[in-house]
């Protein structure tokens, strides 16, 4: 309406649908602290392993020889989100990729334990750098607050500049717009001059 100051943000969503929302390890709609079905970034390696091995899979996959379902199978949902070709090279070289692993599970002959162990290796590799970094930061809490303060100050500075541009576009930056101040000053002079003539005219009359 006023000026092209604010840019409409674009929606950014991952191509991998599994990344949009990970279900809880019990197969519920989402991870929930109250349900206790979360894997936390602060979890130890043992805690992650325990949670992965307790993950919800296919309730009908009772025997290794039974064909399994990957739809609604939490373990495969997590593998969709996190597994990479190099993970298979390191931890499961019998399979070239996730599609081959899924196909084997669906036709039967692949147990849940083997798939869960693979997922655990994948998650441990992804989480270890985060876990180590977090441990380093935890050694110096004042530095964390210092980093947060610097970030807040920088964000506040950018926000102030944006707000100034918005006010300028809306002509409400009364204390910064010199053109507006000049225009108001000229208007005030003209009004005062007019009132002065009215007063003199009234005196003459």
Predicted regions and their residues:
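Conserved small/polar residues in nucleotide/adenosyl-binding loops
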Residues: 192-199
């Amino acid at each position: 309406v006023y000026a092209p100051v604010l840019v409409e943000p674009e929606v950014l969503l991952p191509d991998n649908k599994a990344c949009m929302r990970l279900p809880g390890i019990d197969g519920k709609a989402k991870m929930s602290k109250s349900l206790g079905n979360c894997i936390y970034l602060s979890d130890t390696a043992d805690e992650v392993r325990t949670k992965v091995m307790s993950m919800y899979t296919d309730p009908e996959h009772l025997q290794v020889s039974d064909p399994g379902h990957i739809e609604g199978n939490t373990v495969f949902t997590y593998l969709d989100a996190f597994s990479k070709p190099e993970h298979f090279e390191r931890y499961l070289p019998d399979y070239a990729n996730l599609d081959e692993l899924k196909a084997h599970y669906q036709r039967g002959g692949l147990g849940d334990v083997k798939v869960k162990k693979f997922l655990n290796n994948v998650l441990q590799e992804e989480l270890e750098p985060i876990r180590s970094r977090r441990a380093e930061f935890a050694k110096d809490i004042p530095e964390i607050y210092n980093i947060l303060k610097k970030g807040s100050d920088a964000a506040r500075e950018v926000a102030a500049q944006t707000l100034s541009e918005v006010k300028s576009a809306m002509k409400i930056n009364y204390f910064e717009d010199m053109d507006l101040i000049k225009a108001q000053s000229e208007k005030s002079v003209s009004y005062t001059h007019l009132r002065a003539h009215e007063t003199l005219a009234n005196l003459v009359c």
